C-alpha cells in the first residue's frame, strides 16, 4: 500500500513537471516580469502565445471577457507590452523609475478584443552614452529592474556593451601589449562610451582586474535575461582605435591621429591588415565568452573629422568605402551572420563633413542587409538643428536598413522637457515618406535615463502605433 501511494505521488509530480515543461517559455518569462515589477501575478490574467506573421513585426491583442483578461502576443516582449498597455490605458497601474503601482478592480469590465501591430521589426533602447551618464556602476539588481522596464515598454533591442574592455584587454594581451600599456589607454568606467567611439583615452584611470571580472559576471546575467526575454542585444565591435603601445609591437603600423575636445586617439588605417586581425579576434573572444551574437555596434568618426582626403574628393570616397569594407570584414570573418549597427549621430550633427557623397561612399562598402543605420536624433533635426531629416537628405540611406530614433535626454540632465506630440507622432512622417527606404525599426536613445518619465510613456507607445496618438486624450 505504501509503495503504491509513493508511486502515485511520484507519477502525480512527474505529470505536474511535464505540464509545466510544455508551457511556452515566453509566457513563463512574461509572468515573471509582472511578478518582479508588481509583486504578484493577477488571477484574472491569461497569456496566449500567438504565431508571428511574415512581416517579422510583433503584435498583441487585448480582451476581457467575463472578468478574465486575455493577452495574446507574438513574443515575450509583445506579451509584456500588451499587459502594460492595458493597465496603463485603463488607469490600473504604471511602471516607471520612480515606482510601480498595480490596482485592479475585483472584476474587470469586459473589453472587446483589440489588436495592436507594430509597424517595426526592432524596438531599440539606449544610447552609447547611457553607459557613461547612468549605468556604469549599476549592479545586477538595478539591471534586472531595467530589463523588466524594457519588456513592459516594448523595447526588444537594447545596447549591451558591458565588459567590452575586459574582452578587448584579453585580445591585446595575446597580441603582446603589457598591462601597463593597456591601462594607459583605458578610461574610467564613466568615460568608456567616449573611448569606445574613439573620442578619448586614459581619462580617470584604468579599472582594476577585479572590476573587469565583475563586469564579465554581470554581463553573463544581463545577457541570460535578455535572451530569456527574447531580446536582441547590440554588442560592441572594433572601430579601429588602438593603444599607443601598438607602435612598439608594430613599428610599421599605419596610424592616424584623431582629435576630439583636446583628446587624441590612434586610428588604424583600413588598409592595414591588422585592423581585421584585431577586430575579428575581438568578436571571436567575445562570442567565446558570451555566446553567438548577431548585431554589433561600431561607431566610426563620432564627432571627428574624416582623416581621409579632401571633402568631395575621390580619395575620400574611396577610403571611406574601404574603411566600411574593413569594419564589416572584421565582423564577418568571425561571424558571417553579423550585422553592423551604426549610430548616425554625425550624419545630422556634422553635415558640413558628412555630405551625401561621403555618406553614400561609406555605406556602399557594406552589403545591403548587413548594415543598419540608427538615425539617432530625429528630434534634433526638427527642434535643434532645424535641418532636413536624414532619410530625405541622404535619399533613404542609400538602400541600407535604418532605425528611427530620438534623443529625449542629453548629457544626463533631469529637466522636465519634451515635445510630446512630436514624440507620439513624428515617426508617422518617416513611415509615410517616399524616402523611407528600408525603415525597419524604431527606438529611443537617451544619453541618460531615470528622469522625465512621462516622455518615455509616450515614446514607448508610439513605437507600437501606425496611427496618430492624441497625447491630450
Across the structure, where does each feature detected by a protein language model lie?
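Stable alpha-helical elements in mature extracytoplasmic
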Residues: 26, 30, 79, 83, ...
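Short, intrinsically disordered, charge-balanced linker/junction segments flanking boundaries
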Residues: 16-20, 470-473
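Contiguous, structured surface segment used for ligand recognition
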Residues: 20-120
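Catalytic-core regions of glycoside hydrolase
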Residues: 42, 94, 100-109, 126-130, ...
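Sec-dependent N-terminal signal peptides
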Residues: 4-13
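Solvent-exposed, acidic/flexible segments
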Residues: 23-27, 72, 76, 118, ...
